[in-house]
Amino acid sequence: MLAAGVVTAWLSPLADADLPLHLRIGDLLRTSDGWPHLEPVSWTRAGAPWYAYSWLPEWLYAQAWALAGAAGLAGLHAVLTGASILAVWDVAHRDAWSVWGTRLFLGLHLVLWTIVQPATRPQLVLAIAVPMAWGAALRLRDGETLWGAGMALLAAMLAVNSHLLFPLGLAPGLLILAEAKRAPRGALVAFVAATLLGWCATPYLFELPAIFALNFATNALFGAGAAIQEHEPGFRWFTHAPLGMQALTFLMLVLPVLPSSFGQPAGRLRWLTVAWLAGLGLFVLAVRGLLLWWLLAMPLTAAALGSIPLPQRASTMRAVRAAWLFMLAALPLQAWQARMAMSTPGHPLPTPPLPHPEAAALEPVVAWLQCVTAGDVVATAAVGAHATTVFNYGSYLAWRVPSLSWSVDGRTIFPDSVSRAEAEQGRAGSRWHPPYGSAVAVVLPPWHVTGHLLDGDSAFVRVPLSRAGGTPERSTAHLWARRSWMEAVGPKSGRNACGNGA
């Protein structure tokens, strides 16, 4: 199981849409002398507060990339996935899950974290920290105070430096309340104290209230009309989710009323249901909460899966084992196929360094902008110059063309002047358009209605770009450059110098 998970993670395409932004922030952390407190990337938030609260995984991503490129990043992703599997297995061992329930839970855990959401993002560290917190609570319940408190401390330190929802690490403490008769006196106090102490190990300890206020503020990208798929409310997503995900979600919904749950002591069920409710609340707010719900409901889910009866006939049991082995072999194969599907066809431009979902559309733009902003004089003049794009493009462009300051990226903390334009997605009749009044370059999808405004604006010129042979223009991002900027960068913006015009 561990080998299948590690190999699957190693072969995953690293196609997470937010990964380039995490790499950009990691680069900033590697090259800066202190911890950022002001916006470092986007001109639309210039001077606004910002904190790199996920600094640990972002720094690791940037270090791995600097050392070995995509191979180093894949190796780090495999290590983190393996650590998550081991953390879950430890919980299964300490809580005496059945062999059958452990296998089913780990199998679904692998599918969720390597196929459904193969995230090379800080959330994966939370998939290590939360199971570690469960393991810590179980050790404290069993009287292993030193090991339990130390594990809770480490889990809290990992979580607070990796993810905004680090407070979820307190939920496993409910297990100590659930088995208060078995747990030694002071076990809960030790768990809470170790967790709170671990949370102090962040460079942003005194800024945590400001971090929560910034990231949980009302935003046009949230809610029922969310333009970002992972921010879609959970029950709305459920109505059109794939059948397998609907089945898993239904199982999660009915966990507290299953016979496997009623077979547990009343106190244990009551407190574990509180943790389940916390996860349900996250799922109701946004579908991305499903994975966190999975982590918070681990004991109840494992009990439900373990209650599924095993086949009695030897031939049927052999078939079940064969299907199990087939799934373990199919996971790496599916990851490899996903990597191949994300690869960009050969073209005269350099191969994208990451198989980002928008790489094929953006690499012609990237090649031209990198060429134009190359060189000491031009680069100095261009650093910090404003550029405008859309949410889906911003993460990749912020990483690939850091010499320009982009209007938006993969974060959800932008002002209404930016986020409302993203929420409406440039539809015809939109009252909101991406802010481009001070931009020297604008990069938009071919269908974006703002493109017609730019075509009619004499201050801008549309740049013809090289594309892969046979690649239709509608699949390549469009680029407009300010005429005065084109004149300032001089010959580099010409047809032959930067390869545009095919």
Q: At which residue positions do the language-model features occur?
A:
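Membrane-interface alpha helices of multi-pass inner-membrane proteins
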Residues: 6, 110-114, 135-136, 147-164, ...
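Short hydrophobic/aromatic helix or loop-helix immediately within or flanking a transmembrane segment
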Residues: 44-71, 75
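Transmembrane-helix motifs of polytopic, lipid-linked glycan transferases
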Residues: 75-95
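Membrane-interface transmembrane helices that cradle and orient dolichyl/undecaprenyl
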Residues: 131-149, 178-179, 255-265
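Periplasmic/luminal catalytic loop of GT-C fold multi-pass membrane glycosyltransferases
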Residues: 400, 418-472, 476-477
